[in-house]
């Protein structure tokens, strides 16, 4: 199961927050910014996305929602002037009655099941003239993301990864977003951007995924020795997939998928 470490996640805080800024910039071009009064940030994590939203729309009442106690603690400590609530996204989507000028989510919905019901419900929480805007990683087939799954399926490791041990990411297509939202929307924008991070070596890629999906694989293993072996095999796979460049550094490409949906009138 997923376990979130805010300090580990924020080792790459600049890179993780850049995608928030890019989506917020696009949203600011689409919205009547003076009319943005209420914002919900779903999966607010350590608060970095909520802080960017507050910079863009300082007049708005902004709430961050997250299910991780450690992430909420970090967010409240870093941004005491902002409001953060404990809760999970499907429950909020099914029970919320208020409307928001912006329902926002950064790099979270890939971990949330039931997109067929969830995405239309999120759009229903958007006020007229507002938007649903979210981003998720689009790198599920990239080696760094694929290798833990492949290792877990090997005979040497298979016994440790039974049902419920690992939270699977959403594996649909970008076209699914359009098909799920378009019947309920006045307009849907979808796009993908590939970011190339320059890192010192593959250990930086290991550290990146230690801030997201890799710990759940390591936590499923019986002892530190097994965890060290799994991590080293992961590292070996990364070395083959991400070669060292002429200057001694490594390029780490990372695709991000973006969606903006505007509610239909009436």
Where are these regions (language model features)?
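Helix-to-beta-strand junctions that scaffold the AdoMet/dcAdoMet cofactor pocket
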Residues: 112-113, 126-128
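A short acidic, Gly/Pro-enriched loop at the edge of an enzyme's catalytic core
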Residues: 94-103
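Conserved catalytic/acceptor-binding region of the Class I
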Residues: 116, 123, 131-200, 220-221
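Class I SAM-dependent methyltransferase Rossmann-like catalytic core
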Residues: 2-17
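Class I SAM-dependent methyltransferase SAM/SAH-binding core
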Residues: 38-93
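Conserved Class I S-adenosyl-L-methionine
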Residues: 46-48, 168-266
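A short SAM/SAH-binding and catalytic strip from SAM-dependent methyltransferases
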Residues: 102-115, 138
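Conserved alpha-helix/loop element of class I SAM-dependent methyltransferases that forms part
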Residues: 15-35
